[in-house]
């Protein structure tokens, strides 16, 4: 079962969103934007912490996944 939520955005923002999303659903488009942002954040993270040990990197990845789960739980409320 997929949880759904309703969001409210200004009309001008919605019109721009429709132009940008093309044939994708709004959900697909937003999901892609979020994935792109995650990738960019990971790139910055790797630049900043690339000299860490493999153990430190794995620990940080685990903490980031936990933070992401927590953030997702907030979105689903």
Curated annotation (Swiss-Prot):
Transmembrane segments: none annotated. Keywords: Toxin-antitoxin system. It comes from the Archaea. The keyword Cell membrane does not apply. The keyword Hydrolase does not apply. Possibly the antitoxin component of a type II toxin-antitoxin (TA) system. Its cognate toxin is VapC3 (Potential). Belongs to the UPF0330 family. This is Putative antitoxin VapB3. It comes from Methanocaldococcus jannaschii (strain ATCC 43067 / DSM 2661 / JAL-1 / JCM 10045 / NBRC 100440).
